[in-house]
Amino acid sequence: MSGSGSGSGAGHGGGSGGSIREAGGSLGMMGATREEEYFRRQQKDQLDNLKKKLEADMTQSQQEIRDHEKVLEQHQQRLKEIEKGHGT
């Protein structure tokens, strides 16, 4: 086994690696693989949560737009009534 892959021993990959990676060999590779899977899952969960938050924000913004449009229509109607009453 060469000393150039993930889990191939301490001092590789920039960090101390921890005791599992220090073991090297297949145990170290398995530990490195599990660690990478963990971080990929964490990243996926974060992205999923961000997506849900953005979708909720969009839904809320769309509702606010509808509410504002209703208020605008009411104001326009009142203006028409005022103009009608003044014969303008």
Curated annotation (Swiss-Prot):
Residues 1-41 are annotated as: Disordered. InterPro entries: ATPase_inhibitor_mt. Keywords: Coiled coil, Mitochondrion, Transit peptide. The keyword Mitochondrion applies. Residues 1-18 have a biased composition (Gly residues). It comes from the Eukaryota. One of its GO terms (molecular function) is ATPase inhibitor activity. It is found in: Mitochondrion. Thought to be a regulatory component of the ATP-synthesizing complex in the mitochondria. This is ATPase inhibitor mai-1, mitochondrial. The gene is mai-1.
